[in-house]
Structures are given as structure tokens and as C-alpha cells.
A protein has these predicted regions:
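Cleavable N-terminal signal peptides
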Residues: 18, 28-29
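Outer-membrane beta-barrel strand-turn architecture
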Residues: 83, 117, 192-200, 231, ...
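Residues that define the transmembrane beta-barrel architecture of outer-membrane proteins
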Residues: 143-147, 182-188, 229-235, 296-302, ...
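Outer-membrane beta-barrel translocator/channel fold
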Residues: 179, 209-218, 226, 253-270, ...
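Outer-membrane pore/translocation modules
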Residues: 124-129, 133, 143-149, 158-170, ...
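Alpha-helical protein-protein interaction scaffolds
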Residues: 31-142
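N-terminal secretory signal peptides that target proteins for export/translocation
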Residues: 1-11
Length: 474
């Protein structure tokens, strides 16, 4: 019984050895059979017949065993490009171009892959490596003075007056109270981009904001209403460096000038004393001195961002220092943009920022998702969570400098891409805001004059904006 068992084991072991030898020999034979010549012949056949998936399987297998050539990279890149997998096409086109044998067609496909993948800065580098004739076909109006131009215009409205315009501001003591009603705003933005050097882009933008505000002052149940405008002029400047492929370093600055003339009140102790002795009328104007005050502010933001493309991932880090509404702020954030389908038709962007003001830090988180609806129409949704006040995003381009705190910002954008280098967009954004109101309560008397204790209360309202925008790439 033991002899039979031993023979069976020997035969089993011998069979395994023979099978392993056959596998090794077949693999060696296959490697000998797969040469540059037959890979070139096979991929050329697939290339000419538009059999892109078969070409990818054969080409990637050839790369795995160490076969490398310009034609293989060019054909693989083209196969991924035709299947709209632009992120997979990019490294093959880059490798083909790096050999020095690439023609204009390969560079054009690399340029278009960068554009479709959202890598504008890398695309600009490739654009200026092409011949002037091919460059003019892609960008007919390309020039050294202006690379792109944009214009946005919009209007905002709120329910602040509806919700809070009739509040009893002076409290139970009818002492004193005030608030500012934000009724909306009108704004427009003009931007241009220059490309003096293919790896160095400069962006400029001017933004005008006209806010419709109302100051309410209340004393002894009498309310004074003062309608006024706050006008802001904003200048933004950004530099984008591409020191090496896929890496972008971008410092920026944003200057904000605001002007307004608003009524202010100061307690008039003489008038109040006369009132106590029977002089004067029971009016706010006899207890407080009202005066129009011109207010001018100069604010700024200095920002820096660094990002790096790694396949379908674009991680980044950003930081800023700012002076807004009389206080200093600092921010540091981490972000990542992902194309989960390896094509540009779905992207997800996440950004987490630590914002510090007056030694108080809070976390602000932004989530964005964009997808293609039809061939040229795109839809983006976005939301920002946190205590948003004196805050900036997009490397200082977008500023939240309203004195009222935004608790939630959300919205959507429709973007249409025309075939002649123009993009149009329609944007809706909404904000849930919280503002502060002042109420003075009498806590006692000194020398026949009241002693006030100032109290701060809060009120909420919604703020909505609609904007239209156009951008043209020359």
C-alpha cells in the first residue's frame, strides 16, 4: 500500500515539473516571438483599421515586456485619444514627443489632450512648440498681447429687508439700536490673460461692485432710515509659472477699494440734559447727533498656490494673508481635483481651508462636481460649508468681504462651449447669511444720565445672485 502511494506521489511530482517547464519554455518562446517588427506590424494593422481597443491591449503588452518605440507610443496615444481617454493618452504622446521625432500631428493631439484634461498651462507650452501655420489653425487670433479675455455681469437680491426691516431695534428700554439692511448688489468683471512666455501666464481682472444698503437707527421707538450705496473697485493680478511639465506655481494679489457715505449717530449728553429739564422735543435728533460720514477702505489679499498633475489627480496647496474690513486674516488649504472616469466628462473637486482671524480658527470646506450633459453643455454644482467671513478662494480671485457672515454658500453653473474658442456660462449662487444688530439697554444712571450696556443680537437672511459670463481664447 505504501509502495503504490509512493509511486503515485512521484508521478504527480514529475507532472508538475513538466508543466512548469512547459510554461517557462512557452513564455520564453512568446518573448522571442514578440519583437519590435511584429509589434509594429500588428499595431499598424489595428491603427489603420481603427481597432483602438485591440491596439491598446497589444501595445500595453509590448510595453510590459520592454519594447519601446516612437511609433508604438504615437499609436497608443492616438488609440486612447480616439476613445476620449485623454488622461491615458497624455503620457504616450509626451513620450513620443520626447524622442525628438514627433511631427506636428502628435504635438497637436498632445495639445488637445491637455486642453480636454483641463491642463491649460501645459497646453500653452506645447502650442508654442508647433509651427506657426499649425498654431494659427488651432488659435487663429493668437498673439503676444492677449491670450484670452472674459466678461461677467450679474445682480444679487436678498430677503433681508423682508425678514428684518421691521424689527424693534431699540429694545424694551427704547434706548438705541441700529442695523444695516443688505438689499442686493450689481456687479461686473473684466479679465484678460497674457502669455509673454509659453511657460509664464499673467492674468488681470477688474471687478466693480455696487451694493444697495440701508442704515436703520432707532431711539424711543422712532426710526431713521438712510439709503446709501457702497461702491467697490477690485484689481486682481495673478502669475502662473510652469517650471516643469505638470507643475504650476501661482502667486497673486488682490487690491480692494471701497467707498460709502452713511449716517452715523453719537449720543448728545447736552441735548439729553435739556430734555430732562423740559427743553427740546421727544425726538432722536435731540438725543443723538446724526452726521453723514464718508468711509473709505483699502484692503488687500496676497495668495500663493502650488499644484501638480499626477495622472487623473491634481492635488494642490494654497495659502494667503489678507487685510479685510480692518482685521488681518490668514488661510492655508489643501485641495484635490479628480477625474474618476479617466476622461474630462466628470470631475470632482474638494478643498479644505483653515481660516484664522483674531486668533480664532475655523474649517471651511468646499465641494464641487462637474459633468457633461450634452456634447457642448456642462453642469457644475458647488457648495461651501463653514463660517465664511473675510475669506477668499480660487487663489484670492473670489472674495467674501461682506461684514455679514455666510454660513452656507451653494449654487450651480451651466457652461456651453462653442466650436470657435468661446465659452458662455450662466451662474446661480445662494448664501445663507447671519448678521449682527446693536441694541443698547439702560443698566443705570450717573449724574442724571443713563448708562448703557451694548448688546449684540443676530438675524438671518438669504442672499442670491445670478450672473452671465463669456470667455474667448484668442
Amino acid at each position: 500500500m505504501s509502495v503504490n502511494t509512493g509511486r503515485i506521489f512521484q508521478r504527480y511530482l514529475c507532472g508538475i515539473v513538466i508543466l512548469v517547464l512547459l510554461l517557462i519554455s512557452s513564455k520564453v518562446f512568446a518573448q522571442k516571438e514578440i519583437t519590435i517588427e511584429n509589434v509594429d506590424s500588428l499595431t499598424l494593422e489595428y491603427f489603420d483599421n481603427g481597432q483602438w481597443k485591440k491596439l491598446i491591449r497589444a501595445g500595453e503588452k509590448a510595453l510590459d515586456i520592454g519594447i519601446e518605440s516612437y511609433l508604438l507610443r504615437m499609436r497608443l496615444g492616438t488609440a486612447y485619444f480616439e476613445l476620449e481617454n485623454y488622461f491615458d493618452a497624455i503620457p504616450h504622446f509626451e513620450k513620443a514627443v520626447s524622442t525628438g521625432y514627433s511631427d506636428g500631428v502628435v504635438k497637436q493631439k498632445l495639445y488637445e489632450s491637455y486642453i480636454y484634461a483641463g491642463r491649460e498651462e501645459d497646453a500653452n507650452v506645447v502650442l508654442y512648440e508647433m509651427t506657426e501655420n499649425r498654431r494659427s489653425k488651432l488659435r487663429p487670433l493668437v498673439n503676444n498681447f492677449i491670450n484670452d479675455a472674459s466678461f461677467d455681469i450679474g445682480s444679487s437680491f436678498s430677503n433681508d429687508h423682508t425678514n428684518n426691516g421691521s424689527l424693534d431695534l431699540d429694545g424694551q428700554d427704547n434706548a438705541y439700536g441700529e442695523q444695516t439692511i443688505n438689499r442686493g448688489q450689481f456687479f461686473f468683471d473684466v479679465g484678460i490673460g497674457q502669455l509673454p512666455i509659453r511657460w509664464f501666464k499673467i492674468n488681470y481682472a477688474f471687478t466693480y461692485v455696487n451694493r444697495d444698503l440701508q442704515k436703520q437707527i432707532m431711539f424711543n421707538n422712532e426710526k431713521i432710515l438712510d439709503d446709501y450705496k457702497q461702491k467697490q473697485g477690485r484689481l486682481f493680478n495673478e502669475f502662473r509659472f510652469v517650471p516643469v511639465n505638470s507643475l504650476m506655481i501661482s502667486p497673486s494679489g488682490h487690491y480692494i477699494n471701497s467707498e460709502e457715505t452713511v449716517i452715523g449717530a453719537s449720543f448728545d449728553s447736552v441735548s439729553y440734559a435739556n430734555k430732562l429739564h423740559g427743553f427740546g422735543k421727544d425726538s432722536i435728533r435731540y438725543y443723538y447727533t446724526l452726521k453723514d460720514t464718508a468711509i473709505k477702505k483699502d484692503d488687500f489679499i496676497l495668495s500663493l498656490s502650488v499644484s501638480k498633475w499626477i495622472s487623473v489627480f491634481n492635488p494642490g496647496i494654497s495659502g494667503s494673508f489678507s487685510y479685510l474690513n480692518g482685521t488681518h486674516q490668514s488661510q492655508i488649504g489643501l485641495s484635490i481635483k479628480v477625474y474618476p472616469l479617466s476622461n474630462p466628462y466628470l470631475s470632482i473637486f474638494s478643498n479644505a481651508v483653515i481660516h484664522n482671524q483674531n486668533s480664532v480658527s475655523n474649517l471651511i470646506f468646499t465641494q464641487t462636481a462637474e459633468g457633461r450633459i450634452t456634447e457642448n453643455l456642462w453642469l457644475e454644482g458647488f457648495a461651501t460649508f463653514g463660517k465664511i467671513s473675510n475669506y477668499n478662494e480660487q487663489n484670492g480671485r473670489i472674495v467674501y468681504n461682506d461684514p455679514d457672515m455666510t454660513k452656507l454658500s451653494y449654487g450651480a453653473m451651466l457652461r456651453y462651449v462653442f466650436p470657435f474658442n468661446m465659452t458662455a456660462k450662466l451662474i446661480y449662487s445662494g448664501q445663507s447669511r447671519e448678521k449682527k444688530m446693536i441694541t443698547d439697554a439702560i443698566s443705570g444712571y450717573q449724574n442724571n444720565l443713563p448708562v448703557y450696556t451694548r448688546q449684540t443680537t443676530t438675524a438671518e437672511y438669504n442672499f442670491n445672485s445670478i450672473a452671465l459670463g463669456l470667455k474667448y481664447d484668442f
